[in-house]
Amino acid sequence: MSKKITIPSILISILMAGLVAIGINQGSVSISGISLIYFCCAFIFLAQWLIFIPSYIFETEHYFDLTGSLTYISVTLLAILFTVDISLRDVLLALFVWIWAFRLGSFLFIRVKKAGSDGRFDLMKKDFWWFLMTWTIQGLWVFLTLAMALAAITSESKMAIDIFAVVGTLIWIFGFSIEVIADQQKTNFKDNPANKDKFITVGLWSWSRHPNYFGEMVLWIGIALIAFPVLIGWQLVALISPIFVIFLLTRISGVTMLESRGYKRWGCLLYTSPSPRDLSTS
């Protein structure tokens, strides 16, 4: 990929994260006069760039998804540790992020180790700027996805558990369950030799070609609902979080990328599949 695309994309990713950080730092606790949100944002990007170095040297993508998941866990822990006044809402947010990140990170790491490689990275891992752009965008992904949770956890405004927290928790459980079940169903399907060179249309996959992504979108909406009541003023910029997740999964890296690869592999069979692209379109 041309440097005319990769370098500006890297800079734009950093700029976007910086602008959102400036917005949601209002009302956030500070460390030595500096908003904890800024520390979290910097930590996220530095973690990606640190692991990018050996990954590029050894041309491996094996630790890409794992690094992202560990970053979710560690930066949320950082926010919890440096926020003095922690509420039950904060604990719920952190717990849900940790459960999701640990489950997905371990699942993806085991999958790539088992497969030996991830086809998404075949070309980009050999191109310094393209690969760096990908790691930087992951940093943006982590920060924007976590924006609602981080803004709420680090906020000086605290509230008792309310209807938003209850409904948000139920939505998170629903979305997380769909993602876990969908991933397990696909794993079981691919482990069956009789299904070689076939695409899955059983279980949740008979309703959608991407139920796992649907579940992920839903669970982050749940987290946004839990976090919403304690946000004030410019912290509401964090509402970009679930919108960003939905846009990214449906238009950039998730559904769009897999649909493109799917059409190349299975062609017109996808058109005759009973499964729509997404549960939201069924």
Language model regions located:
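Helix-coil boundary and interhelical linker segments in multi-pass alpha-helical membrane proteins
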Residues: 20-39, 77-95, 146-168, 225-238
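Cytosolic, membrane-interface loops and tails of multi-pass inner-membrane proteins
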Residues: 110-126, 184-203, 258-273
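Intramembrane catalytic core of multi-pass membrane enzymes that act on lipidic substrates
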Residues: 57-156
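N-terminal membrane topogenic signal
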Residues: 1-12
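Central hydrophobic cores of alpha-helical transmembrane segments in multi-pass inner-membrane proteins
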Residues: 43-54, 71-76
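Alpha-helical membrane-protein architecture signal
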Residues: 128-133, 197-206, 214
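Single conserved hydrophobic/aromatic residue that forms the stacking wall/gate
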Residues: 271-282
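Transmembrane alpha-helical segments that form the membrane-embedded catalytic/substrate-channel core
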Residues: 47-53, 98-114, 144, 170-189, ...
